[in-house]
Amino acid sequence: MKMNLPPFIEIYRALIATPSISATEEALDQSNESLINMLAGWFSDLGFKVEVQPVPGTRHKFNLLASAGQGAGGLLLAGHTDTVPFDDGRWTRDPFTLTEHDGKLYGLGTADMKGFFAFILDALRDVDVKTLKKPLYILATADEETSMAGARYFSENTAIRPDCAIIGEPTSLQPIRAHKGHISTAVRVLGQSGHSSDPARGVNAIELMHDAIGRIMVLRDSLKERFHHDSFTVPYPTLNLGSLHGGDASNRICACCELHMDIRPLPGMTLDDLNGLLSEALAPVSERWPGRLTIFDLHPPIPGYECPPDHQLVQVVEKLLGEKTDVVNYCTEAPFIQTLCPTLVLGPGSINQAHQPDEYLETRFIKPTRELITQVVHHFCWH
């Protein structure tokens, strides 16, 4: 059956040629069903048991879990099947045609992160999965680039409990054991419109928001003072005011003002605690103006994540690569996979190429990535 598996570069080419864009805008959003079915066929050919899982609340999106081996524990290799949209005017190549030039493989998803599945398949093409002493799981998720709905749903509903997991996001083969979370929040203030010549006849939402922002700034300073993690370049939780919209004319009392902000919590900080701190900070405004201030999530929140530095997975990967683990500020699906088992983020390609025009993966990553996958599978599934 394995004779049917295409060569590495042809697997890569087929993955890139199969669009699977995730977007909040419905017109741009695409199902990943074709890509999932393609992966399902290849992993079946390698002897894996394949399960395709519809993801509720999405526009026809699916997860795939391929399983081989018996017993408990083992290794999970995970990644997402979707990409971000692309700006056609800024690409100099067809995003859906894998193009090799000057030591680089170009295409949408080459680095972030369809290519990781080509590496897994290629590393396993000569493996008899019936000889595994522990389970090997391959997880392909949906909607990482928007809501992370695939990883959320999988982690909440699966019964598998591997010994450890590796998520193949582009880290330039630098193992990552921790990252901050992300909370994207809106604060909306409702006033009462009126003619600006008589301010007493209205309630100016901008003035109420001014009060609210002042209290949010106090919270920002408090977070910086109270929470610290020396491993991060920015060692405290950040709070950013991203956009502010309110009013429609200079001679009208503003009836509505809305602030969009984000908080990037450190590992170990709970989302409930942070939401509580924000509500507490804005309580004086709410009490003075009942019913006029609301707080809501713009996107599903992502907690911070950290793999224990003394875990066997960290020690094994550091020894194999000769590289110490690091931490980053961007987010991945690791917080959700970490609820199942200790997790590292580690994969080929550079994060600097993710979400960029003419995205590429350097061919220098091909050999070491194939070797790394072979080694970790051997260590965690045959020992």
Curated annotation (Swiss-Prot):
Q: Where does Zn(2+) 2 bind?
A: D112, E145, H355
Residues recorded as binding Zn(2+) 1, renumbered to this chain, are: H80, D112, E169
Catalytic residues (UniProt) = D82, E144
- Pfam family of the protein (one): Peptidase_M20
Q: Which pathway does this polypeptide act in? A: Amino-acid biosynthesis; L-arginine biosynthesis; L-ornithine from N(2)-acetyl-L-ornithine (linear): step 1/1
Is Hydrolase among the key words of this record? Answer: yes
Q: Which domain of life is it from?
A: Bacteria
* Location(s), subcellular: Cytoplasm
Q: Which UniProt keywords apply?
A: Amino-acid biosynthesis, Arginine biosynthesis, Cobalt, Cytoplasm, Hydrolase, Metal-binding, Zinc
Enzyme Commission numbers on file: 3.5.1.16
Molecular function per GO: acetylornithine deacetylase activity; zinc ion binding
Q: What class of enzyme is it?
A: hydrolase
Which cofactors are named for this entry?
A: Zn(2+); Co(2+); glutathione
Reactions this protein catalyses: N(2)-acetyl-L-ornithine + H2O = L-ornithine + acetate
One GO CC term, this protein: cytoplasm
Q: Which GO terms describe its biological process?
A: L-arginine biosynthetic process
Chief subcellular location equals cytoplasm
Family, according to the entry, reads as follows: Belongs to the peptidase M20A family. ArgE subfamily.
According to the record's subunit comment, the protein's assembly and interactions are: Homodimer.
Protein's name according to its UniProt entry = Acetylornithine deacetylase
- Species of the source: Enterobacter sp. (strain 638)
Protein encoded by which gene: argE
